[in-house]
Amino acid sequence: MASALWTVLPSRMSLRSLKWSLLLLSLLSFFVMWYLSLPHYNVIERVNWMYFYEYEPIYRQDFHFTLREHSNCSHQNPFLVILVTSHPSDVKARQAIRVTWGEKKSWWGYEVLTFFLLGQEAEKEDKMLALSLEDEHLLYGDIIRQDFLDTYNNLTLKTIMAFRWVTEFCPNAKYVMKTDTDVFINTGNLVKYLLNLNHSEKFFTGYPLIDNYSYRGFYQKTHISYQEYPFKVFPPYCSGLGYIMSRDLVPRIYEMMGHVKPIKFEDVYVGICLNLLKVNIHIPEDTNLFFLYRIHLDVCQLRRVIAAHGFSSKEIITFWQVMLRNTTCHY
């Protein structure tokens, strides 16, 4: 009886193993066939930025500003304008910035203005949301909005809108910064940094990314197709967490954008425009001014940075409140 049982068990186990083997082989065959069916492209090693350039400004965007009371600072001379990308429904994130690093409008007599960049949430947007955004803008006067869809893949359109708005409606700003709602900005340090610059023209800085490879894998957020970007390496560019530029570059970059087809990544797109304009990125001597990845910064470290990425709205409020206290830092 026992020997018969032992004879049956191995045969069942063998059958189970065979089933799993066949399943794995089927999956492997499927992926091989899928991969072979994909169009294959030769990655271009040597980058030619003129590949992206059109002599006529055929890529000039004609989206419309949609708010009735349009944001305008053409009659002001702000030292710094900070433009923050935001989603229409993310009121909490905007409010967190308004009561923390974006609240103070003057630092040592230098005017700093903060505005939020929005698109349209859906093709047929909810009327209540549209009205609430109008009310929010009437209350704070800090929203810039156009009628393109507000999606991750349209972030480049949002950046083009930012450059257009500064060029047309806020041309006197001495410096301009573009950042995101999940970034903690130490506004005081930013103003000090700009005041200590030796030059104020052809200046562009942030968290530099040099020889960054284009990603062709499965993760859609960071994937870019060969058709959209055929080169192996991206141009030198500054991460979208926060880049800063002098006034003279804004209209030049905006004009160049009309000649360069938008790509998925807005910061890379700006980098392409900079390379075509032959503008070099200024790399800060202090490598701890910009933090790209979320790290466990304490309050004393935040007192020394300009921008740190990866903060929730609640964390921005908490860290700002703690940073304002008279905590002694010994390092």
From Swiss-Prot:
| Catalysed reactions, semicolon-separated | a globoside Gb3Cer (d18:1(4E)) + UDP-N-acetyl-alpha-D-galactosamine = a globoside Gb4Cer (d18:1(4E)) + UDP + H(+)
EC class, as a word, reads transferase
Gene name in the database record? B3GALNT1
List the Gene3D superfamilies hit by this protein, alphabetically: 3.90.550.50
| Any one GO BP annotation for this protein | oligosaccharide biosynthetic process
Q: Tell me its family.
A: Belongs to the glycosyltransferase 31 family.
| Compartments, as annotated in UniProt | Golgi apparatus membrane
What name does the UniProt record give this protein? UDP-GalNAc:beta-1,3-N-acetylgalactosaminyltransferase 1
Q: Which UniProt keywords apply?
A: Blood group antigen, Glycoprotein, Glycosyltransferase, Golgi apparatus, Lipid metabolism, Magnesium, Membrane, Signal-anchor, Transferase, Transmembrane, Transmembrane helix
User: Which EC number applies?
Assistant: 2.4.1.79
Q: Which residues are glycosylated?
A: N72, N154, N198, N212, N326
Segments on the Cytoplasmic side according to the record's topology features: 1-20
- Per the UniProt topology annotation, the Lumenal ranges are 44-331
What species is given as this protein's source? Homo sapiens (Human)
Superkingdom classification of source? Eukaryota
Q: In which pathway does it act?
A: Protein modification; protein glycosylation
Which cofactor does this sequence's record say it needs? Answer: Mg(2+)
Chain's role: Transfers N-acetylgalactosamine onto globotriaosylceramide. Plays a critical role in preimplantation stage embryonic development.
Q: Give the bilayer topology.
A: Single-pass type II membrane protein
Name the Gene Ontology molecular function terms of this record: galactosylgalactosylglucosylceramide beta-D-acetylgalactosaminyltransferase activity; N-acetyl-beta-D-glucosaminide beta-(1,3)-galactosyltransferase activity
Expression tissues: Higher expression in heart and brain, and to a lesser extent in lung, placenta, kidney and testis. Lower expression in liver, spleen and stomach. No expression in skeletal muscle.
**Residue intervals passing through the bilayer:** 21-43
Primary location recorded for the protein, binned into one broad class: Golgi
